[in-house]
């Protein structure tokens, strides 16, 4: 086990944290590569693993690792959907500063609030579960993807084929999975 001495912590704090405001501190802690100008989806994983392990509102998930993974991916997707204005699956410091709802405030609230469902921005398990159930309902072949035929069933077949085709083609927000071009 690694040990952090007082001297190491003081050096780190004075160099990496003290000169910066809380949003830049968050950015500097979350990004995986200290030379990177961006936070990428995987950079959130260690923090979400700790949240899943220690948050009292998520204790019930300890016995279901498959739902822990789905919950974490959904939280990350919700963060990027609302914050990543370029749809690049990368968040700059500027994106973080402009985020509305505030990603930093949501993480602060997750640290303070015991009822995870009261954290409506990104972390609510109830919100995740509604999304998951809708996805499960549409993904009838259980391949983990929603194709055009699956999407046509949404809302009792409320979407036209032309609308669904435009969505599948990436009109509006691009349909990209992190790590792909």
Place the predicted regions along the sequence by residue:
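Primarily EF-hand calcium-binding motifs
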Residues: 1-13, 21-41, 62-90, 127-143, ...
């Amino acid at each position: 086990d690694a040990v952090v001495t007082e001297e190491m912590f003081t050096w780190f704090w004075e160099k990496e944290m003290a000169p910066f405001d809380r949003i830049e501190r968050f950015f500097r802690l979350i990004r995986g590569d200290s030379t990177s100008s961006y936070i990428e989806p995987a950079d959130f994983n260690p923090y979400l693993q700790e949240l899943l392990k220690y948050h009292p509102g998520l204790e019930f998930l300890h016995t279901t690792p498959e739902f822990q993974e789905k919950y974490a991916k959904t939280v990350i997707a919700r963060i990027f959907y609302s914050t990543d204005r370029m749809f690049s699956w990368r968040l700059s410091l500027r994106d973080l500063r402009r985020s509305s709802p505030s990603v930093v405030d949501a993480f602060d609230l997750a640290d303070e609030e015991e009822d995870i469902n009261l954290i409506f921005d990104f972390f609510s398990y109830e919100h995740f579960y509604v999304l998951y159930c809708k996805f499960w309902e549409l993904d009838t072949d259980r391949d983990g993807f929603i194709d055009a035929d699956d999407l046509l069933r949404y809302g009792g077949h409320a979407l036209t084929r032309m609308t669904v085709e435009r969505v599948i083609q990436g009109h509006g927000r691009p349909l990209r999975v992190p790590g792909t071009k």
